[in-house]
A protein has these predicted regions:
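Conserved alpha/beta-hydrolase "acid-adjacent" motif
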Residues: 387-391
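A catalytic-pocket lid/entrance helix-loop region that shapes and gates access to the active site
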Residues: 181-183, 188-288, 421, 437-453
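Glycine-rich nucleophile elbow surrounding the catalytic serine of serine-hydrolase chemistry
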Residues: 171-181
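Bacterial N-terminal signal peptides
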Residues: 1-9
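Cap/lid segment of the alpha/beta-hydrolase catalytic domain
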Residues: 84, 93-161, 207-208, 215-216, ...
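Catalytic-loop region of hydrolases
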Residues: 13-86, 102, 243-248, 257-338, ...
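Alpha/beta-hydrolase fold nucleophile elbow
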Residues: 162-173
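Short beta-strand/loop motif that positions the catalytic acidic residue
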Residues: 379-381
Length: 509
């Protein structure tokens, strides 16, 4: 009888504690609802896996730090007996604009109190939300993430009657940019951060998107040519690591020149015209400022040109064009008639640096305060990423080391920053390689969930136990689900995997 009373009383107390959060006083914010949920099921949707979130208190909050701000977020709180004592916040993607609760399933089921924000607006796939709303640019750039962090921890303390022992942030793409922004602007918000494929040089990246679109308008590259380009780049560079597996292990060592498949006569899908050779070379090299000659952003890497989530989607499928054009037409020029066909790349870059870089760019190398806080930062980037070219992330880590050295800090960043480059992976996940290592919102069933195979678990172990990850094991699930999965070693940059071990890399350019 006593046991039965306990079983009845515990859910009732949890529901009462959850509903009580509606009365918590929050600066310039309010709890819209706080409801005890027995669980939430997410069906398969596109390439999204089906998932089930366990019981939790779902708290919806709206914050108005300025009169122009309308920041929404949702916080999921596991039952007190299931809480691991920690807080994990997820980042957004693209232009944000949605409280994407699917991202909360895995951290909740692992015992985290977890939250995600809409970045302060409702999305329509463009930057139109910024027109006439300068504060919403700041909300999107950095403020919504910080507000969500501060308010969530206030609610966590009220619900559990104790503060979270650790706080983590995990994001990829724009979420990766948000992750670096937190380390740079709000170094005490999080004890550990995972930044995947960070769109850190936002103003430069958007300018590069427009430059690439202009390049392809003037010198088109048919998608039917991508298979020949990839076949040739793999023939040139796949075996440089000693293994022919359809993956370029380190594209920086690749010397592929598309002129190798220039048409000798006529034109067909197995070769490139002279103009197409020049176009592909320019895409690999990255766009330059036509006035100064300075490179605007690193270019694309060889080896995944024909992958559905790489060049086929981002370069020829219009994704770069869509993001870049809206960035300038709506955010930078505020709907004042920017003409994509007659745009001046030099002028556009200068305008972007003036009007959006102060709020969106996140490549400040000064991480002294984050290091002093005891923060740990793990970065990852796919070598086949055609959305955010990967060399920019390597350059950022190098810039941090150089900055620290110039300011009397240890140049060796191993104590708080580590980067993992992922061969055969596109943007954030996916591609022909082994690309599952805790980076997806919901991991596939074949993924071993421990700190050797999961980057978020590796971060937690580093923060709580002081054991930094030297390597990760990435998995490529195969069907049927009970078949053996393919794995690949991911090494701490600048090391590379050779014969099942991480070894020092050579000297790529």
């Amino acid at each position: 009888m006593l046991a039965l009373l306990v079983l009845i009383t515990l859910p009732a107390k949890a529901d009462e504690a959850c509903r009580a959060l509606a009365g918590v006083a929050l600066a310039h914010a309010r709890v819209e609802s706080a409801i005890e949920q027995p669980g939430v099921d997410f069906p398969v949707k596109g390439d999204r896996l089906a998932a089930h979130a366990g019981a939790h208190c779902a708290v919806r909050v709206v914050s108005h730090p300025t009169t122009d701000s309308d920041i929404h977020f949702e916080l999921w709180l596991p039952p007190a007996g299931a809480w691991n004592g920690k807080y994990l916040q997820k980042g957004s993607g693209g232009w944000g604009g949605e409280v994407y609760t699917y991202a909360l399933v895995t951290p909740l089921n692992r015992g985290y109190a977890t939250a995600v924000t809409d970045d302060g607006h409702v999305a329509d796939g463009t930057a139109r939300f910024t027109v006439g709303h300068p504060q919403k640019i700041r909300d999107f750039g950095y403020r919504a993430i910080h507000e969500t962090s501060v308010l969530s921890r206030r609610l966590i303390a009220a619900y559990y009657q104790r503060a979270a022992s650790q706080a983590y942030f995990v994001g990829c793409s724009d979420g990766g940019r948000e992750a670096l922004m937190q380390a740079q602007r709000f170094p005490a918000d999080f004890d550990g951060i995972v930044a995947g494929a960070p769109a850190a040089r936002w103003s430069h990246l958007m300018t590069a998107f427009v430059a690439n679109a202009r390049l392809l308008d003037n010198a088109p590259l048919p998608s039917s040519k991508l298979a020949a380009i990839q076949k040739a780049s793999l023939a040139s560079c796949d075996a440089l690591d000693g293994v022919r597996d359809g993956i370029v292990d380190d594209p920086r060592r690749c010397r592929f020149d598309p002129a190798a498949i220039q048409c000798k006569a006529g034109d067909n899908d197995d070769c490139l015209t002279a103009q197409q050779v020049a176009t592909v070379r320019a895409l690999y090299a990255g766009p330059v400022d036509p006035v100064t000659g300075a490179r605007i952003h690193p270019g694309l890497e060889p080896g995944m040109e024909d992958d559905g989530g790489s060049w086929r989607l981002w370069i020829l499928g219009g994704e770069q064009r869509k993001f870049g054009f809206s960035n300038f037409a709506d955010l930078v020029y505020q709907g004042q008639g920017w003409d994509s066909t007659g745009s001046d790349i030099h002028r556009d870059l200068a305008a972007a640096q003036e009007r959006e870089a102060p709020y969106l760019d996140a490549f400040n190398p000064d991480l002294r305060a984050f290091r002093a806080h005891g923060g740990k930062l793990l970065l990852f980037h796919g070598w086949g990423d055609a959305a955010v070219p990967p060399r920019g992330t390597i350059e950022y880590v190098q810039d941090v080391g150089n900055f620290m050295s110039r300011h009397g800090e240890p140049a060796n960043l191993d104590g708080f920053v580590r980067l993992f480059m992922v061969p055969g992976m596109g943007h954030c996940w996916g591609g022909p390689g082994a690309t599952s290592f805790g980076n997806e919102e919901v991991p596939p069933a074949a993924l071993t969930q421990d700190a050797d195979h999961d980057i978020v678990m590796a971060l937690d172990r580093w923060v709580t136990q002081g054991k930094a990850p030297e390597q990760l094991i990435a998995t490529r699930p195969v069907e049927p689900a009970n078949s053996s999965a393919r794995t690949r070693l991911l090494c701490k940059y600048p090391q590379v995997a050779r014969n099942g071990r991480c070894v020092a890399a050579g000297n790529p350019p």
